[in-house]
Amino acid sequence: MTRTTVDELVFFVNGKKVVEKNADPETTLLVYLRRKLGLCGTKLGCGEGGCGACTVMISKYDRLQNKIVHFSVNACLTPICSLHHVAVTTVEGIGNTKKLHPVQERIAKSHGSQCGFCTPGIVMSMYTLLRNKPEPTVEEIENAFQGNLCRCTGYRPILQGFRTFAKDGGCCGGSGNNPNCCMSQTKDQTIAPSSSLFNPEDFKPLDPTQEPIFPPELLRLKDTPRKTLRFEGERVTWIQVSTMEELLDLKAQHPDAKLVVGNTEIGIEMKFKNMLFPLIICPAWILELTSVAHGPEGISFGAACPLSLVESVLADAIATLPEQRTEVFRGVMEQLRWFAGKQVKSVASIGGNIITASPISDLNPVLMASRAKLTLASRGTKRTVWMDHTFFPGYRRTLLSPEEILVSIVIPYSRKGEFFSAFKQASRREDDIAKVTSGMRVLFKPGTTEVQELSLCFGGMADRTVSALKTTPKQLSKSWNEELLQDVCAGLAEELHLAPDAPGGMVEFRRTLTLSFFFKFYLTVLQKLGRADLEGMCGKLDPTFASATLLFQKDPPANVQLFQEVPKGQSEEDMVGRPMPHLAADMQASGEAVYCDDIPRYENELSLRLVTSTRAHAKIMSIDTSEAKKVPGFVCFLTSEDVPGSNITGIFNDETVFAKDEVTCVGHIIGAVVADTPEHAHRAARGVKITYEDLPAIITIQDAIKNNSFYGPEVKIEKGDLKKGFSEADNVVSGELYIGGQEHFYLETHCTIAVPKGEAGEMELFVSTQNTMKTQSFIAKMLGVPDNRIVVRVKRMGGGFGGKETRSTLISTAVALAAYKTGRPVRCMLDRDEDMLITGGRHPFLAKYKVGFMKTGTIVALEVAHFSNGGNSEDLSRSIMERAVFHMDNAYKIPNIRGTGRICKTNLPSNTAFRGFGGPQGMLIAEYWMSEVAVTCGLPAEEVRRKNMYKEGDLTHFNQKLEGFTLPRCWDECIASSQYQARKMEVEKFNRENCWKKRGLCIIPTKFGISFTLSFLNQGGALVHVYTDGSVLLTHGGTEMGQGLHTKMVQVASRALKIPTSKIHITETSTNTVPNTSPTAASASADLNGQAIYEACQTILKRLEPFKKKNPSGSWESWVMDAYTSAVSLSATGFYKTPNLGYSFETNSGNPFHYFSYGVACSEVEIDCLTGDHKNLRTDIVMDVGSSLNPAIDIGQVEGAFVQGLGLFTMEELHYSPEGSLHTRGPSTYKIPAFGSIPIEFRVSLLRDCPNKRAIYASKAVGEPPLFLASSIFFAIKDAIRAARAQHGDSNAKQLFQLDSPATPEKIRNACVDQFTTLCATGTPENCKSWSVRI
């Protein structure tokens, strides 16, 4: 039968019909929205469906359910060819700044948007939930964001704002009209409450009847027979069929064709593995592949059923069927719970997950263990197979023949006497790739505890999903008892072997997990047998073991934010000290805020793609561009030979714009391809072939130490008599601590647009950078023109965190060269994997310490040698090391001290500035040895910390006097507000009663110096224009990256000029308004630029004074007009430099810092000793921010910094190969904290009555200081591990053990030594290369 074929794509976007006659299967919805439709609210954050910045809502008529359905998707993975006859809603389609949707309004007014780059995606996730359920529960709201990431806020304000939609306890914002208000949950009565950061009563109510309707044209097509779709692109053909007959015919004709439903796997392979599939078949319309049927054996799911449907059907079955029939269903549901975000589960199919045959699949081990049955078909044949150990014959292979397809899968009902569990351990619970997954099933002989069937299946333990076929048969007919447990564990340890260089690494951890999972399964079954009155046959469960079977659940959140209200009588127009929302919050929430890549494309614009080294250290022997030139749209390939000025660049002139003869790291920029589109530039860049001659490479800190490979002389501070101090000490402890690096993971990657002006060498650049001055000067030097020909503009950034302070110039110089060479505008926005590969991150540190102390815990001597991995250029590494050594004392007075620092020169991408700038590393080392002092002395750690704490007027080890030392106040307040002593007793009680779960509690202080340590950078400038209508245009030297700097500066100007903030506007930061600016860094930008603005405003006010005296009853506008008509200038510059700064390392004298910021955090955690997973139960923070300029922004900075620190110290881990290649290049492999990672109880209090006389309006810096407080989580984890080690008889349990940072599940599990870790201890054979190395 011949069917009609359609080659015209029809869909709707925000209610408008789109007809695309030339649909390209390689074009994603994200590209189409941004480039073709100009809808730039939807952002590119990662390109792999891992961050949610591109989230949009899809609506379609579901013919099986006979209703309109709404679901969220990742536009970056959604092919436009899959959108025929559906409706797409983007953030622009639900509201705008003239009329915000309630979702947009609430995230803006609750201060849930900082840099704003992630905001549209989060808005659309929430909007989609409300379209499906206008009155969701708190849990449903939190689950809606499993596929979204935010790097700025710390998530609390987003959740708090959106919980106002919940029917079961939304926040009232402290208004007192909700019994579930999180502020009323605090037990602390020692601090007076403050008014709320926002008032939910101001929010518009949600009215579901006012939402846009589903396009009637599409509704009319619901019963129309579907026609085959065929779209042919430049390289790929897409065919969407609606009958099984068509599909099987096509598969017979084209056995290599790929079947795509959600594109969550194929899309990744095409983008990141450069795989090309010339024919793609979409079977999403076929009835047999999308149907669900309840049969006698179980529930049958069509292979194209999305996982969200599987989840929904299984949930209904669990709710309605007897418990004994749903054991398998609950196991599958547990895996789906953590599988991925809604955006992926809405489109990814169950069949796709099976056929992908991933060795680390979440579902395949569970389905294999469950006795799932699969139906396969090809033209003319159909067969049914069990999904057993034979189904996956090898890596990414199944037993399907090339022309076969998977039709359906039956997930079976469980039988009487059958028990089932599913397990998964990853770096992060939410939306993470598993390290190990498992499905476990046992069937007992009727009325006994004798094993009739046992199935133990694992992912992550081989190149395929495996079943423990050697171990399980030996257990048949055995009783479920301790003897069986020991036999199975011994068998698994022997059977499930991993080579030391196994992909993914973590060999001992993964092997231990298999035993831990079975032990959990054993205990779970034991509990259920007890409930079935069979306990006597198998033994009684130890009550302290019971919690080992409990999964970490999401508990109701309890968040508190306390701050000092403004004085009574302060003018309503004076916004200083008030929780004013971010100036751009409404624009960010509506998608109207313009970021660099959102700037409309120029008519003749070109695209650039970098070509980088694949070797860590090598000579460049040849560059072949012949294949690149064959790509359509190719324009040119740029190398060092094309640079008209200097190819030498970098802070210390030790870098190149393009590598010339030699590369010194993987990711070293060799050249750049320029083409007509980003896609063509990408393809052409892949076509550039480079041959190398390898040279010896230095990758790790240890390699550098061994080879004496360092940058410059050592940094050194010494005070007192170290030899005498150690000789007088009662105890001396020595050790090492390694602190891993960290990726910035700003949601907006590096982006530059260069526009040549066509005369006198002028060029205008739009750059996502924190450092306009260096961007300007580096480009001018490269082009061989004066700085005054280059104008650099920054509207806003989608996050920075130090990563755009210097490394942005790597991209901007290349783009500027391309614009110079072609005479046309050129744009480049790095893909996430490129950005992570090229731009470096936080410096890894290795510290070797020796501390001397008395029995009382008093520190008398300290020596620390710090080593950092600087990478292939010096960049800012020296200043970072200096700050680390400045902060090696943290908050403690140490009479005899020596700190040294060496920067290792290695063949890695240069590491650079990152929030904290070396301070967190120096302070973590301090708290590490401090905790060891407490353990050695047998004293409470909080007592030892308090005993050694500085006092007012003390001199630091670098001889700066501490004035206004509020840290003891912060400490005492945190001890009280956290109920530390009572909770410490509760933790000890919990640990006595639970063997396999342990809790830890720790309180940590911080003292952070404020100023650039390079003293001349401590300057700020401003330009203030007052127009004749009284409006003010404000410009200053700082850039906005989400920290609220522009908002605070408007507040400063408003108070200074005594006018409303509504009259003041900031357009951008640019080099042609405020020249020679310092980078927006060091937490000093509000201090420097705020004072400069104040000075400029005072100049304006002085000029207006005569007119105010002449007309005292006049208005601001009248005084301004009078000044104008009197020919008085209404424009003024302001300048400020921080006084009395300057430090000499030679004499250990002077003041490196203007003042210090202080804070204290108390955190409680619970660890799962069997898996290494942990849950952050509660954090209390007391932070001294002086007299806050804006409590909402400051609390947001405290929370955001803390959560970023939580990632640094417990989660984020960079993996490099021994050859220096980065494995972790995106959100699928590199995990930052997610919504579910933050403390369940998160309480932040700004210290009251502590004005800071050294900064604008008595405020203090806040961006960096709170980050280190997240180490309280790290040390709470370490305390919990210590309790676990004591439980399991480690003779050294109450002494010292190693825990490097970050405290990942692998490190936690391996540190909780027990019988399972002993069974799996292997060690690495000599001369064996591991999968990754500790850099």
From Swiss-Prot:
Residues 231-416 form the FAD-binding PCMH-type domain. GO terms for molecular function: 2 iron, 2 sulfur cluster binding; FAD binding; flavin adenine dinucleotide binding; hypoxanthine dehydrogenase activity; hypoxanthine oxidase activity; iron ion binding; molybdenum ion binding; molybdopterin cofactor binding. The keyword Transcription regulation does not apply. Signal peptide: none annotated. Binds 1 Mo-molybdopterin (Mo-MPT) cofactor per subunit. Coiled coil: none annotated. Its cofactor is FAD; Mo-molybdopterin; [2Fe-2S] cluster. InterPro entries: 2Fe-2S-bd (IPR002888), 2Fe-2S-bd_dom_sf (IPR036884), 2Fe-2S_ferredoxin-like_sf (IPR036010), 2Fe-2S_ferredoxin-type (IPR001041), 2Fe2S_fd_BS (IPR006058), Ald_Oxase/Xan_DH_a/b (IPR000674), Ald_Oxase/Xan_DH_a/b_sf (IPR036856), Ald_Oxase/xanthine_DH-like (IPR016208). Its EC number is 1.17.1.4, 1.17.3.2. FAD binds at residues 259-266, 339, 349-353, 362, 406, 424. It comes from the Eukaryota. It catalyses: xanthine + NAD(+) + H2O = urate + NADH + H(+); hypoxanthine + NAD(+) + H2O = xanthine + NADH + H(+); xanthine + O2 + H2O = urate + H2O2. It is found in: Cytoplasm; Peroxisome; Secreted. Key enzyme in purine degradation. Catalyzes the oxidation of hypoxanthine to xanthine. Catalyzes the oxidation of xanthine to uric acid. Contributes to the generation of reactive oxygen species. This is Xanthine dehydrogenase/oxidase. It comes from Mus musculus (Mouse). The gene is Xdh.
